[in-house]
Amino acid sequence: MSVISMKQLLEAGVHFGHQTRRWNPKMAPYIFTERNGIYIIDLQKTVKKVEEAYNFLRSVAEEGKDVLFVGTKKQAQEAIEEEAKRSEMHFVNNRWLGGMLTNFTTITARINKLEELDKMEEDGTFEVLPKKEVIKLKNEREKLEKNLGGIRKLDANNVGAMFIVDPRKEKNAILEAKRLGIPVVAIVDTNCDPDEVDFVIPGNDDAIRAVRLIAAKMADAVLEGRQGEQLAE
């Protein structure tokens, strides 16, 4: 049984690539044909590549390592958050802050600040502070939550893989992963460079349904791997 079927991929529109004038020639092996000025992705290859990525992420989770889900474009934000939470993993879906992995000490300080502001809100500190001050602190908290909420519990040393939607948009995340030797799994559209990615999943990175389908399969892989890890214990 394949991890994913051609029918599922077709229904989610995974086969629609970008316009032919916006393409990366390195994606040629994954292109099936061209229709009305748009490249059509070879879904037989996608089926195979989803399977490879699935098996890899499952083995990462089996080893007790974490997977960081990254997708900051509008079409990916919701699916990235939901699927990361479902598989009890970490995510970045608003903005990749420079040094998120390579300068984790600074990021940790900001996460601590977020925790501190949460505590102030919970223990009633906000109620005794001047209104102006509270508004300022609440705005700061909101901004930190937006950018760092998904990595609050992250241990940067335990990231075994990164799952990315659109490597072109997330080039900074990829650079940091490369520097730290973290393998990257990504949905790669016809306008991206597949050489930047360790596990290429050729597919449409602009359709919400397509992104959700593949992100869900990657989360399933993590869940299956975690089950295996528990059984091994």
Swiss-Prot record:
Listed Pfam families: Ribosomal_S2
InterPro entries: Ribosomal_uS2, Ribosomal_uS2_bac/mit/plastid, Ribosomal_uS2_CS, Ribosomal_uS2_flav_dom_sf
An example Gene Ontology CC term for this record: cytosolic small ribosomal subunit
Gene Ontology biological process: translation
Entry GO MF terms: structural constituent of ribosome
Keywords: Ribonucleoprotein, Ribosomal protein
Segments forming a coiled coil: none
HAMAP family found in the cross-reference section: Ribosomal_uS2_B
Family (UniProt): Belongs to the universal ribosomal protein uS2 family.
Record PANTHER family: 30S RIBOSOMAL PROTEIN S2 PROKARYOTIC AND ORGANELLAR, SMALL RIBOSOMAL SUBUNIT PROTEIN US2M
Entry protein name: Small ribosomal subunit protein uS2
UniProt organism field: Clostridium botulinum (strain Hall / ATCC 3502 / NCTC 13319 / Type A)
